[in-house]
Amino acid sequence: MNKRSIAVIGAAAVALGAQAGLPTGLRFGEHLTIKPYLNVAYTYDSNLDTTHHGESDSIFSVTPGANAEWKGDRWSLSGNAWYRYKHYAKNNSEMGEDSYGQGLTYKYSSSEPDQKGWSLMLGERYQNISASDSINSGDGRGIWRDRERINASAALERRFSSRFHVGAMAQYDWLDYKNGSGYAPLYGWSSWGTQLEAGYAITPWTNFLLAGGYNHYKQKGTSYTKNTSESYTVMAGLGSRATRRIEYRALAGASWLNYGGHNNADSGWTYQLDGNWKVTRTLNVSVRGSSYYQPSERYAGNASKIYALSTGVSYLTLGDHLRLTGDVMFRHEENCYSASRKQADEDTLSFRIGGQYTINRWVSVFTTLSWEREWYQRGTSYDYDRFRGTVGLQFHY
C-alpha cells in the first residue's frame, strides 16, 4: 500500500547521541528532529541501457537531502526530501537530467499494539526520475526516458477487542513517461484501489486474516480497446500479534482481471507477504512479496501480472559504526491479456550487498555492489546482465 506546514518557535538544540561519534541531527524542542545530509558518489554501470550488448558508463552524483521526524505521545510525522545532480561521462546529453523527490508518513494509534482502539497511517511519495538502477526498485523502466511517479496510501484499523480487528486500506498510483527520445514509447498508467481486512486471534501470537480488494486501472496511449480495467482479489492467511521480535503478514488467494471491457480476461492465484525478524539488536532479516495486475508499460492494449519476492539482511557492528546489508530480489512479469502485439514474459533476478561506515558524526563512507540478470521469453538476444558498483561519502550532522 503507498499540505504540510510545520512552524516551530524556539531555539534549536543539538542532542548528544546515544553512541559517541554518531550523527544525531538537529533537535527542535523535544519532538522535532531534522537530519540533513549530502551524498557525493561515483558509480560504474556495465550496462547502462539494459540490452544484450550494453554500453558501460561512469556516473558522478551529488545528492543533498534531509530526513525529519516530529513525534507526539501517540502519533508521528516523518518525511524526507532529496535532489540528485548526475553527470554521465559518455551519455550526459541523453541521461544527465537531475532527479528529485519527497515523501511523508503520518501514524496515529489510540492504544497499545493489539489492544482495543483505533490506528491510522497516511503516506505519500513523489519522484521525478531520469534513470532507474533496477526495475526491482519499483519506479518504472525509464531507461533513456524521464518519468514521474506519485504514490499515496491510507490504512485505518479498528480493534474491537484484543482478539478481533477490522481494517480498511486505500491506495493511488500514477506513473507518467516522457517519451520522444527516439526509442519506442513507454506507456504510463494510473490506478486506485481499496482492500478490506478482518482478523481474529486464534492463538496468543497469531491472527487469522481474511481480505478482499478491488483495483481500477487506466492506461495511456491505447487505441485498441477501452483504456480502463479492473481487478478483484480474495485472500486468507496469518499475521503476527503480541510479538516484538517477529512480525509478519502472509496472505494467499485468487484474483480476477477485467481488461478493457473484456470480462474475466485473466484469473489466477495471488499473494501478499511482509515479514521482519529482529534476530538480535544488531541483526535484522526481512522478506517482502506480492503479486498484482497492471497495464503493460511496453505495449498499448496489453495487461501484465507481476510476481515479486525479495529478502534482505542488515547487520550493525563495530560499536554501531558499521552497517552491512544484503538483499536478493526476483520479479516475474507475464502477459495476461493482449489486444494488440503480445508482450513477452520476462524474469529479473538481482543480488546486492552494501556497507556504510560512520567515521564520525560528520562523515560516513559507503559502497554498494549489485548484479542483475534479465531473461526474455522472446529469445536470448534480448537477455542481459548488468553490474553496478558505487562508492561515496555522506556528510551529515
Predicted regions located by residue number:
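Cleavable N-terminal export/targeting peptides
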Residues: 1-29
